[in-house]
Amino acid sequence: MFNKLKTLFRTRTPPPRIVQARFDAAQTSKDNARHWAAADHLSADMEAAPEVRRTLRMRSRYEVANNSYAKGLVQMLANDTIGTGPRLQMLSGDEDFNDEVESEFMRWADAVKLASKLRTMRMSRCQDGEAFAVLATNPKIKNPVKLDLMLIEADRVSGDLKWLEDDTSVDGISFDQWGNPVDYRVLKYHPGDVHYMPGDEAIHVPAEYMLHIFRQDRPGLHRGVPELTAALPLFAQLRRYNLAVLSAAEAAADFAAVLYTDAPANGESDEVEPMDTIPLERNMMLTVPAGWKMGQLDPKQPAANHSEFVKIILSEIARCVVTTYGTLAGDFSGHNYASGRLDNQIYHKSILVDRSFWETEVLNRIFEVWFREYTLATMKNVLTERHLWFWDGAESVDPAKTATAQEKRLANNTTTLAAECAKDGRDYMSVLRQRAKEYKLMRELGIPVAGKEKNIQPEPDDGSEPKEEMDE
């Protein structure tokens, strides 16, 4: 009985509390409503609609053409990514075959100006958002292989008015049911060309002969937007600020001096003609009317903060292409050795990633078609072998320290000569062959070889100290 009463009047356990959590960024208030007003729920392709990409391309090209920082940024990316051009290294077991293919590919690349065209494609990808190149036959190529790269601007790859109703195409690119590109619709003339007429017939290029590169920032994106998109307003702000500072300085400099008086109206000061101008001469004494003072205009412009503002804007611009202020501006005056190397490491890491993209999407496809044409031209039935691509190496900030570190890695077997040469964009086999030729010639000419090991005498049995053999 007592237990029943105890259970009846015991303290009940309160119900569990439900935690109500939310994301602050998902809330809309009067303070942030205007900031998030332009946020949308469009798909990747609709967000990058043809009209949007056309506007972005025009503004990006305008800014690159009129802004030295934007122009330098685009050229810097092309020069650092492509450089003097990639170099082929074959990995088959036949060294003679490797040398022959590498030499022939180099001759063909020089004939078609491959490095220059790749740099143009890199600039177009940054400025226009995407680049196109057709693998076509050019009978004027001075090489047994008549393959050529014909560059096409993004404006020419365009769909007709029915592409919105066709779920298998996106603005000039047709896809199969698995999402693979099948066909590219290329206009005969650029839409801004004098020969262009709306409704002209377009050229359809099979996907296997078309190179299309762009940065896919969202799944489902099939056409690229300029890499400078996020920085375009910043470039405009920087140019406007520079013009404002210059205008203020010019306005203040236009007036060498002004006359003003503290006397009241109709006071004792001499009368002067308002807005009258007086020519001034250098190193001359000047008298002013009684009651008047001479002064100069103060521009009231924060010129002292101008350089800091430019640095902040350029630092923000640099991040859209994964670089830093020092690299973009070419100004390392505030850096020491360590910070300068750190800046370059961040930038060169992105260059390595981008080069991997170029190898997969561009170079391997070019080599595949070239090798097929090469075997047909030389009447050789050879299967495609494994290969690598060498790029230009990055210049060292301190060559002496870099060479010392390289020597230590080779001495303790934590690296290989092939890996070290690859960092400089060189083939270790070519380096060794060239060094062997140089050593042979130096011995023939009687020139001492630097770093040659000295012959060491065996340790004598009588316990005396061994004598060093003197070089002749």
Predicted regions and their residues:
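Surface-exposed loop-to-helix/strand elements on domain peripheries
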Residues: 88, 92-103, 286-401
